[in-house]
């Protein structure tokens, strides 16, 4: 089989997870903004080169750097940056994986005001903002707010709703708000942006509560599927209300030989969903088709604020609404010995259990290293492992993972022994603190 890969969008490496998480990491580590931007460019370039060579070095793959435009269900026209047609290719199997783009709101003055960026543009600025105003209070907004606050920028979030993180556990959401405010982040809720204007080198944000000035504005107002300018109107592929390619459980579009993977098909916008989409398409094309969107299990996610929030499954309020009889437990990060070594006591871990089956319904982990821990809980949920297995498992010490010994205890026992780890006062913790500091 000859595979032709038309390289146009590379969201993950160029403008998504890799550059943002590199900057977030370097901000936490105390790097200057200039140093972090330089390293971000190096990381992006290195991974781009690696991925390109990984594809281009294979005899049965051609990598073409063109804009792709459908002219029928089977025929794709390839154009260069000037719009000149370079060639036309025909295929009996096609995968659309063009990702997503920023959703730009219709706000007066948005086209003429200066220094207004979407997340892509903000990753490529060559100066550190002194005053950053973020329009929107979703996960992208929170990651950028936390990141720039760590670099010393004063950040203001403008959220039109009455709260942020309303879909998360509210105990944890309240802690996140407090920790962001402790960094100097201002969060203005019930605030609608009406217009933008310029005043010398400042951008003026006009809201229903007055005016705010800043040298930089981020539009964190969501993303939408990248289906524009693909020529899909020349095909029988159906598009949804948000511009997404409509697919079935095998990720086939309404034209059965055209598949869609990643953000372009709508739904959860995570890199690892796109990677699993590949497994589903591979299973349908070359296997028995048994892997589908209906059986890939619980989907974890992490919001890479500082410290990160990671979650999988249900929170308590959702579980109750679905009729479950639940057990709920929590452990504060300040009661986990590893927090002393990490020098970070911020955070709270919570778990929700099905009281009848003893299976884990969900977990929300707000604290350092949660982005790693959540994957173990995802595995337990998928494999229907009772919570007692995680409760009684032997974990290395001192680690954040050993918090599961307490997190999955019955609530009464958790209150009695939380934080009472043998060896905490005289051996492991002081030794590993010295190792960590050197």
Where do the PLM segments sit?
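FAD-binding beta-loop-beta segment adjacent to the flavin cofactor pocket
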Residues: 102, 236, 243-257, 310, ...
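Flexible, glycine-rich terminal cap/loop adjacent to redox cofactors
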Residues: 1, 5-8, 13-18, 22-23, ...
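FAD-site-proximal beta/loop scaffold in flavoenzymes
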Residues: 112-128, 211-288
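Glycine-rich dinucleotide-binding loop and its adjacent helix/turn
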Residues: 17, 96-154, 158, 186-187, ...
């Amino acid at each position: 089989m000859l595979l032709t890969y038309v390289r146009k969008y590379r969201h993950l490496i160029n403008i998504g997870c890799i550059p943002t998480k590199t900057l977030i990491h370097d901000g936490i580590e105390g790097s200057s903004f200039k140093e972090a931007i330089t390293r971000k460019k190096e990381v992006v370039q290195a991974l781009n080169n690696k991925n390109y060579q990984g594809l281009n070095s294979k005899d049965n793959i051609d990598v073409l750097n063109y804009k792709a435009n459908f002219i029928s269900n089977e025929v794709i026209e390839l154009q260069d940056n000037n719009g000149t047609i370079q060639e036309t290719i025909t295929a009996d199997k096609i995968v659309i994986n063009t990702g997503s783009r920023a959703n730009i709101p219709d706000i007066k003055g948005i086209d003429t005001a200066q220094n207004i960026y979407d997340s892509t543009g903000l990753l490529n600025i060559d100066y550190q903002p002194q005053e950053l105003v973020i329009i929107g209070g979703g996960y992208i907004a929170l990651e950028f707010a936390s990141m720039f606050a760590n670099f010393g920028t004063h950040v203001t979030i403008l959220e039109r709703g009455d709260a942020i993180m309303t879909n998360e556990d509210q105990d944890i959401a309240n802690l996140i708000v407090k920790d962001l405010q402790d960094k100097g982040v201002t969060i203005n809720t019930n605030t609608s942006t009406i217009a933008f204007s310029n005043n010398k080198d400042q951008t003026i944000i006009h809201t229903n509560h007055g005016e705010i000035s800043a040298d930089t504005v981020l539009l964190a107002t969501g993303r939408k599927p990248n289906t524009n300018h693909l020529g899909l109107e020349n095909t029988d592929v159906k598009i949804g209300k948000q511009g997404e390619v409509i697919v079935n459980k095998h990720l086939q579009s309404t034209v059965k030989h055209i598949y869609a993977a990643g953000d372009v098909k709508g739904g959860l916008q995570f890199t690892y969903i796109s990677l699993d989409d590949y497994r589903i398409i591979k299973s349908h094309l070359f296997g028995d088709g048994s892997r589908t969107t209906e059986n890939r299990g619980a989907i974890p996610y992490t919001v890479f604020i500082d410290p990160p929030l990671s979650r999988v499954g249900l929170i308590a309020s959702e579980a109750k609404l679905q009729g479950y009889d639940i057990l709920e437990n929590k452990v504060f990060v300040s009661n986990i010995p590893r927090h002393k070594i990490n020098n970070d006591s911020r955070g709270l871990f919570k778990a929700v259990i099905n009281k009848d089956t003893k299976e884990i319904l969900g977990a929300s982990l707000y604290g350092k290293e949660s982005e790693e821990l959540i994957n173990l809980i995802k595995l337990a949920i998928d494999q229907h492992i009772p919570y007692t297995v995680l409760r009684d498992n032997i974990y290395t010490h001192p680690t954040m993972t050993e918090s599961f010994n307490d997190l999955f205890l019955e609530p009464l026992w958790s209150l009695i022994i939380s934080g009472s780890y043998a060896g905490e006062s005289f051996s492991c913790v002081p030794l590993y603190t010295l190792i960590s500091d050197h």
